[in-house]
Amino acid sequence: MSRIESLTRARIDRSKEQATKTREKEKMKEAKDARYTNGHLFTTISVSGMTMCYACNKSITAKEALICPTCNVTIHNRCKDTLANCTKVKQKQQKAALLRNNTALQSVSLRSKTTTRERPTSAIYPSDSFRQSLLGSRRGLSSLSLAKSVSTTNIAGHFNDESPLGLRQILSQSTDSLNMRNRTLSVESLIDEGVEVFYNELMSDFEMDEKDFEADSWSLAVDSSFLQQHKKEVMKKQDVIYELIQTELHHVRTLKIMTRLFRTGMLEELQMEPEVVQGLFPCVDELSDIHTRFLSQLLERRRQALCPGSTRNFVIHRLGDLLISQFSGSNAEQMRKTYSEFCSRHTKALKLYKELYARDKRFQQFIRKMTRSAVLKRHGVQECILLVTQRITKYPVLINRILQNSHGIEEEYQDLAAALGLVKELLSNVDQDVHELEKEARLQEIYNRMDPRAQTPVPGKGPFGRDELLRRKLIHDGCLLWKTATGRFKDVLLLLMTDVLVFLQEKDQKYIFTSLDKPSVVSLQNLIVRDIANQAKGMFLISSGPPEMYEVHAASRDDRTTWIRVIQQSVRLCPSREDFPLIETEDKAYLRRIKTKLQQKNQALVELLQMNVELFAEMVHFQALKAGFIGMPPPTLPRGLFRLESFESLRGERLLKDALREVEGLKDLLLGPCVDLPLTAREPALPVEADSGSCPGVTANGEARTFNGSIELCRADSDSSQKDRNGNQLRSPQEEALQPLVNLYGLLQGLQAVVVQQERLMEALFPEGPERWEKLSRANSRDGEAGRAAVASVTPEKQATELALLQRQHSLLQEELRRCQRLGEERATEAGSLEARLRESEQARALLEREAEEIRRQLAALGQNEPLPAEAPWARRPLDPRRRSLPAGDALYLSFNPPQPSRGHDRLDLPVTVRSLHRPFDDREAQELGSPEDRLQDSSDPDTCSEEEVSSRLSPPHSPRDFTRMQDIPEETESRDGEPTASES
């Protein structure tokens, strides 16, 4: 039993091992089958981020990708099912399939003679005629697919499940080879046979005309006998006209090649994204429509100029009217927009084409096979883009040559001259638009490269961020060298914009504002540009706010000259800060956008009203023609009513007066000059209803007419009433009433436009509400005509400017008022102090006057008792107010000055004759002497002093010995004023 169990256990283990090996083999086979797709044997590799996928043309960002070592194709893992068959394996499969098909078909034909009927080989491979029909009738390349040509069930025929297995395999292999052949035929069929077919189809409309313009010139295209009938000037003119039509035909062919061959092939065959194809061929549909229409007009003019019985001989005498219609009006505007867009994106389109050609192998193969054809040998993508860009520059040259040979017909010469002016204006506008679009693209590129957090402070204005750049237009830019205060040169990018100069630096492949010793944003207001005398490339930029001087250096002398010229032009055109603030807040930006939209809506409303007037005039003219007035010219439309740029267009009172004048003239025509309108008829708010009966009126010849709600335009009965004395035909009153009616309608519509604009204006000027507007309306009604005209003459642009000016004046007045208040307070304080000082000085003056009067009386009384000798030696010297130390000897005796006596409470002074010899006291000495009251108080009881004491005080000492005794007097006994008291004497 143990042996049997061991054998059983061994058998079970072997079965488990076999099952495990089988599962592993199946897994390996599944993994191999997963890698083997469409003949590709994919292996997993690691790639970098710059590797492009062959299937979707996108970068492979994953760490692992699939590569086929047979054909060296690297793709995403998700793109392996969309990849075409392997090129090297496909060739082997085709050869093997052909061999198998030949042997299989022979065996099938031998076996199926008795069982089934033989099927033709066209069921497997389409015949040449069928293939040509497919190529000739196709509009896309999807018609060659297997599903639309031959089906698998049709190939299998009536085979059932009992059919031999080998036959089914042969048929399936032949079907696969057919499917493979159809897939490879997609691009190759277009290149080998489809290009010429496509070209013939797209030029089928101009096939006959293209053959007529195969010759190089008109002289070679017409018959020689017909050529000899014309002068040399006519031949030159016709040669240029022939060249114009021929080059226009070639231009249309170029545009159709771009649209129908290249673009269609890229979209349908290469499955490229529409945005990429649009970047390669911008606005080609619009350009094709414009030039196809123009070419049709030129060819129609040629057919009209053909000689009878000939298809080659023609002479075009008039071409100016056709050129004027092409290069003016809506056609010119459409050409301007399309050519501006195309030419501005010309550089980007060429750059994109070169990038695609360098990195995309399928695109490169497509372009090579397309240009292999004889039709497209000289019409590659780059050549087509360049030809379209240069086409608009050829028109002025051709028209100028036609003009030089058109001196015979004056009207034609004037039309050609006008057309030449229009073409030059169009070319100038396109050039300007291209320049602006290029600058906008350049500004957007700089904006995208700037650091989002980059800001620079502007003195007194706040931070200047990168969003402020988009508010402005880029005028000029370039790299310069900025010389700093330390003498070093820094590379900067200088942007000349609408109102500022901006200095930028590049850091970590991003632009930031310069962080040097001076502001990086310079206002163009009062900016001075000067070149450096001793340097060929340097220039100074001197700004006034804040006062700074920048020294920059250009790359060359011509570059510096260009910078100086464009900066000076921009300084002259720089807007004011009231119209264009340096830094705009979000609220101001939103308000500006709203005002712009409001102006656009007003403009659209005015255009609609103008269109309304035109339609009304057309309707009235049509009714007049229906009424029997054949040959009546259409009424002229009133001009100048809908021009927003003129102040006169907004004077509603003038329009109303003109409307009333038209009503009076219309009344005179319909009712007669002697009939007055009733008061209700003058009011515009009372229209005549259709069912209100008839309104009697009197015509010019006295016949009664009835006007049922509208004016009937009818012809007069007799022709004699419509002729004057000279027999000239006169216009009937109804005909004369037509023009005033149109004028009246236009004036009323213009008045409506004025009312709407003024309402918008008042709403913008007075946001407080309707009460303010009612008050203003009442005030204006009292002011009279001058006030109404002033309010009506305000345009939205003018009111915005005046509002900004008023706000600026209000802020300035507020600042001036505050400054005046502070100055008034300072002046009031100063005036109070001056008044206090004035009162003190008045009191001191009155006191001094009283003292002087008292001293005069005392001197007069003293002079009567003992006059002072004027020749006294001590009277010749000035009075010393105080002595701290006394000299000894004769010098002290000779320099003695007696003290001034005092009597009572009054001070005794010297006589006027003696005092006039003394020098006046200065301020310090007067301070030391003190006031008269102080000096009088220092004396001890002046009433007890006798006259002898007074005389002794005034007499000099008798000898120098007395001076010796006087030296012993201590200084403490002297008075502060330098005068001895009565006790000391």
UniProtKB/Swiss-Prot annotation:
Positions of the PH domain: 473-572
MF annotations from Gene Ontology: guanyl-nucleotide exchange factor activity; microtubule binding; small GTPase binding; zinc ion binding
Coiled-coil blocks: 591-615, 797-866
Regions that span the bilayer: none
Principal subcellular localization: cytoplasm
Modified residues (N6-acetyllysine): K354
Bias-annotated ranges (Acidic residues): 940-949
One biological process term in Gene Ontology: positive regulation of epidermal growth factor receptor signaling pathway
Pfam families recorded: PH_16, RhoGEF
Subcellular location: Cytoplasm, Cytoskeleton; Cytoplasm; Cell junction, Tight junction; Golgi apparatus
Residues bearing the modification Phosphotyrosine: Y893
Gene Ontology CC annotation, any one: protein-containing complex
Biased composition (Basic and acidic residues): 919-938
Assembly description: Found in a complex composed at least of ARHGEF2, NOD2 and RIPK2. Interacts with RIPK2; the interaction mediates tyrosine phosphorylation of RIPK2 by Src kinase CSK. Interacts with RIPK1 and RIPK3. Interacts with YWHAZ/14-3-3 zeta; when phosphorylated at Ser-885. Interacts with the kinases PAK4, AURKA and MAPK1. Interacts with RHOA and RAC1. Interacts with NOD1. Interacts (via the N- terminal zinc finger) with CAPN6 (via domain II). Interacts with DYNLT1.
PANTHER family tied to this protein: AGAP007712-PA (PTHR13944), RHO GUANINE NUCLEOTIDE EXCHANGE FACTOR 2 (PTHR13944:SF20)
Protein name (record): Rho guanine nucleotide exchange factor 2
Species this protein is from: Rattus norvegicus
Lineage, broadest ranks: Eukaryota, Metazoa, Chordata, Craniata, Vertebrata
